[in-house]
């Protein structure tokens, strides 16, 4: 089990329903906001296995977003859309829940169906979207950090 640092500024919650994948996690966050009477209009999602994604990329992403132009924004680099690096309007909650009930599980397919805007980010090495999925990836990340 993972031991999390306790903080009054961080809330942890279990997915409201298991087996729904990343979209279920997004919906869980939206439901938590509603249930806890938060006045948030947006949530951000970022994978936790991308050690080279920095505040610089995050700041650029937020600066380029025009929230009156959409309800869902993802980051794009080169020709790749990064479907977990996102900003999601809480207004998508009912549609997301309906589509999950109908069996949709793929973030890319769902985002395409409702309409998604992208913000292109150019970057220098190391690749901020490099993610660690295997022991080999971890070794590579350690080497990148040593050489950076």
Regions found by a protein language model. Name each.
Residues 1-104, 112-129, 135-136, 140-146:
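Nucleotide and nucleotide-moiety/phosphate-recognizing core
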